[in-house]
Amino acid sequence: MLNLPVPEAEFINEVLKPSEEQQEMVSAFSERAEEVRASLVNPTVDNMLKITNDGRKCALDQRLLNELLPDAEKSKVNTCVENAFQVWDEGKADRTTQLIFCDLSTPKGDGTFNVYDDVRNKLVARGIPKEEIAFIHEYNTETKKADLFAKVRAGQVRILMGSTPKLGAGTNVQDRLIALHHLDCPWKPSDLEQQEGRILRQGNQNDKVKIFRYVTENTFDAYMWQILENKQKFISQIMTSKSPVRACEDVDDTALSYAEIKHLPQVIRTLKKKWIWMCR
């Protein structure tokens, strides 16, 4: 089997401090979990799944839970915008491209706040032409997707945003990709592999690429990355029993990259004990 080259990745972990509002929300999630466990609330009103979803939204952007909350200056969204703009600016001559993955807060087209529109609006405000930024969700036929992917490969569309289901397997736009951004943490190791497989791919003209992972410290981000690591370890144990040498090398690389961005403060450790069933 041919061992064709793929780009070398530089992993950049952007670990950001939570806002005061986010810290208050995390404390409230713990209280909600206690009430759910004690059956003090109707499960149709609140439950562990709802708390988890709210926790993930809080870690991504506090405005997803309350649009009236301020736009935190050092949020994941604003840090991603800053990085994406810098990469875009540095790659003007070669028309390099970027992918931004975000599984939560996808565009609905109904006027409600979402991360996709917020990112695009801020990038346009910085000077990026709107036609160079695309959402995969706006291309709902195979013909439209093929046209979009061709524009990305040609460097006409230079920033493409999407979710794992829509921008994962089968997306071949690697030609000019220079950077990939994880705005939120996927649920499954295979999702992470699918996302990063878009850029760490044969046919990429760039020898070195950047992969940004954004984590809001002391929020559910840490919990989600911990779950991902636990699942990867389980899969790795199975792999190791089948092929010790090769699997061990793969496991070490994966485990280290997860461990670097894992931050488990006391509140997250407490939630992990309460919700250990979610790792099953």
Regions found by a protein language model. Name each.
Residues 120, 124, 129-164:
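Conserved helicase ATPase core of P-loop NTP-dependent helicases/translocases
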Residues 108, 146, 160-182, 188-205:
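SF2 helicase motor core recognition
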Residues 190-193, 199-275:
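A conserved SF2-helicase RecA2
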Residues 19-23, 105-107, 140-141, 166-168, ...:
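Conserved nucleotide-binding/hydrolysis micro-motifs of P-loop NTPases
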Residues 40-51, 93-119:
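Conserved strand-helix element at the start of the C-terminal RecA-like helicase core
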